[in-house]
């Protein structure tokens, strides 16, 4: 028995603690919430009686106490005409990948509601500026943006809604919105394109029998000076139209639209795409002036050009939507890539001409013949001795004790002495030398030694001769490639500009 009492007491204490905690939590939530405004039609008679009779609040209560926001003005009568105008605060750049743009606007709607005519005893101004909390108490058009992707209201620091009620029953509502709107792009002329982006305002539930949207006369869309990073937008290029739509089963729904014409600025793409790719193509032509034998210089130059252009194509493709048609920029990049690839193909043709088997065999035979001719010339030079000399030289010998110098010495002192007495005593195997007996070089202006030195000098090896056909290909390429690229530029810019 005592055990059951203890359990019951424990359960009772737990319930009390839980109830106290829930009350504390709800009170904290209530403090954080803003007090909700009740429309006059929802307030009790006692609450309405507390309002002073001559106050503006009392006049509003008298207007709205029997007001039903669920019923449109002129119910079962003529449709309500809603005059619309827009003030554009900011205009975001168009995103090519998602095909949309973002705007920040003041949307203003004005209509007449006979139920909201101010009483004759109202002595204030012709319009009442009403707190946005009363906006929910009024009937309002069910406007939405037909091509909207996302949108949001602004409530910093207060809810950005402005409400006016005029003496004759006109109601003006202005609200600040940020909207992302779809804009289907035609990128055929990209980046020299002009885009037309729409903003469509449509009724969601009311047909044309109940509601009609009308653009305000004058300038329904007010646009201040707005600078976009890639586009130019001007007030003169804004168009207005009617886009009333028919939906099967429900009928016609009112719709108005504004069309913004945006012209793309080409400067960014000129500096970032066209100029670099043009220079890369011109760089690939430098290989035509490099010796065909210099493969280490020509091949990397061509490969660098092709890879750079291919990388540029890949980078731009990632930044643009995947469309099924060819854009103007694609035509340019493909043409530049073909010119770079053609320079590589041209060098391949030159290499085929250089490595032709018949040409290689003929070159080997020519080099061998040249080497044989050089060998014969060296033997003739070695036979040029004193007795075979055509020009007389002054020679002398040096004798130390009983040993004679092992070579004939020619010196400047001998040339001055004009001594020919020892010529007959020289053995036949002695040869002239350009060195004296002490191994020092001497200069002989008209003697046999200088002639023999020239003849004994080994000639350089024969250089391979580049075929005329290979040279002709490079020569033609130097003129043909720039001419073709210039012709392509004339056609390209005349079409797309």
From Swiss-Prot:
Residues the record lists as Phosphothreonine modifications: 391
Positions of transmembrane segments: 269-289, 295-315, 328-349, 473-496
Family: Belongs to the ligand-gated ion channel (TC 1.A.9) family. Glycine receptor (TC 1.A.9.3) subfamily. GLRB sub-subfamily.
Spans within the Extracellular topological domain: 23-268, 316-327, 497
InterPro entries: Glycine_rcpt_B, GlyR_beta__ECD, GlyR_beta_TM, Neur_chan_lig-bd, Neur_chan_lig-bd_sf, Neur_channel, Neuro-gated_channel_TM_sf, Neuro_actylchol_rec
GO biological process: acrosome reaction; adult walking behavior; chemical synaptic transmission; chloride transmembrane transport; gamma-aminobutyric acid receptor clustering; monoatomic ion transport; nervous system development; neuropeptide signaling pathway
Glycosylation sites: 54, 242
Positions contributing to glycine 2 binding: 250
Superkingdom, natural source: Eukaryota
Modulation of this protein's activity: Channel opening is triggered by extracellular glycine. Heteropentameric channels composed of GLRB and GLRA1 are activated by lower glycine levels than homopentameric GLRA1.
Cytoplasmic topological segments: 290-294, 350-472
Species the sequence originates in: Bos taurus
Positions that bind glycine 1: 108, 174
Gene Ontology molecular function terms on file: extracellularly glycine-gated chloride channel activity; extracellularly glycine-gated ion channel activity; glycine binding; transmembrane signaling receptor activity; transmitter-gated monoatomic ion channel activity involved in regulation of postsynaptic membrane potential
Record protein name field: Glycine receptor subunit beta
Principal location: membrane
